[in-house]
Amino acid sequence: MKQMILASASPRRRELLQGLGVPFEVMSSDIEEKINTELSAPEIAKELAYQKAKDVSNKLDGDYIVIGADTIVEYNRILGKPKDADEAYQMLKLLSGKIHRVITGFAVIDCRTKKEIVDFEVTNVYFNHLSDEEINRYIETKEPMDKAGAYGIQGKASLFVSKIEGDYFNVVGLPIFKLGVVLRNHFDINLL
């Protein structure tokens, strides 16, 4: 099997790939994430994922498969990672009692053949109504500070979610099913 490189510093993406038992290395991208507001949310996620994968693939020479990903939360606007506790509060207040979309773009690049596939997955997430106390207590845990939309579904914020429509792992940060299909169908890599 070709050596896989995860072009992401996200511990959640690393854990998801480790859970599959797939050997891989982590090599973070150095790109500055800039959002082009003229693009749709899926196009933004795909573009950022591609930039990360391309940045890392340009540094490699050999038989590598590079996987880049970017997750964004959308409810009337793009919700990235909060800059501070106040912004986290505003994001969680906005999502309270609402249905929002989590979009993860991903890019797979074969460094040897130069083949590139870029795709995305969308999951609808239903949030319960959150009290100010719940929001503030959650922010005090510091859990929301490095996550798009100011929450991590795999952590304490699981208490906020009444249901999802789509891929749970997409909300965590990597659409495992769709990534597996792309790797199998386009790169002849089976994750089993």
Curated annotation (Swiss-Prot):
<feature type="site" description="Important for substrate specificity">
    <location>
        <position position="154"/>
    </location>
</feature>
<dbReference type="Pfam" id="PF02545">
    <property type="entry name" value="Maf"/>
</dbReference>
<dbReference type="GO" id="GO:0005737">
    <property type="term" value="C:cytoplasm"/>
</dbReference>
<dbReference type="InterPro" id="IPR029001">
    <property type="entry name" value="ITPase-like_fam"/>
</dbReference>
<dbReference type="InterPro" id="IPR003697">
    <property type="entry name" value="Maf-like"/>
</dbReference>
<feature type="site" description="Important for substrate specificity">
    <location>
        <position position="71"/>
    </location>
</feature>
<dbReference type="GO" id="GO:0009117">
    <property type="term" value="P:nucleotide metabolic process"/>
</dbReference>
<comment type="function">
    <text>Nucleoside triphosphate pyrophosphatase that hydrolyzes dTTP and UTP. May have a dual role in cell division arrest and in preventing the incorporation of modified nucleotides into cellular nucleic acids.</text>
</comment>
<comment type="similarity">
    <text>Belongs to the Maf family. YhdE subfamily.</text>
</comment>
<feature type="site" description="Important for substrate specificity">
    <location>
        <position position="12"/>
    </location>
</feature>
<dbReference type="GO" id="GO:0036221">
    <property type="term" value="F:UTP diphosphatase activity"/>
</dbReference>
<keyword id="KW-0378">Hydrolase</keyword>
<keyword id="KW-0963">Cytoplasm</keyword>
<protein>
    <recommendedName>
        <fullName>dTTP/UTP pyrophosphatase</fullName>
        <ecNumber>3.6.1.9</ecNumber>
    </recommendedName>
</protein>
<keyword id="KW-0546">Nucleotide metabolism</keyword>
<feature type="active site" description="Proton acceptor">
    <location>
        <position position="70"/>
    </location>
</feature>
<dbReference type="GO" id="GO:0036218">
    <property type="term" value="F:dTTP diphosphatase activity"/>
</dbReference>
